[in-house]
């Protein structure tokens, strides 16, 4: 489900990837959390790639629309 949502936000003409950020669990970072703009990620099989950082899907905490502040996805 999460992979499909990210693909939709990246490729569907109704959405602009520049409007979204992904907040993910990153041990050792402030509050153990980092953010990456959706437009800068590449989807692999079971993880996202940002620069040379691999982010497993299970570490994604939320996806936020930066224009509206709406949380599109939030991990339970």
Curated annotation (Swiss-Prot):
InterPro entries: MJ1316, UPF0248. It holds the Pfam family MJ1316. Belongs to the UPF0248 family. NCBIfam families: PRK04257.1. This is UPF0248 protein MMP0286. The lineage of its organism: Archaea, Methanobacteriati, Methanobacteriota, Methanomada group, Methanococci.
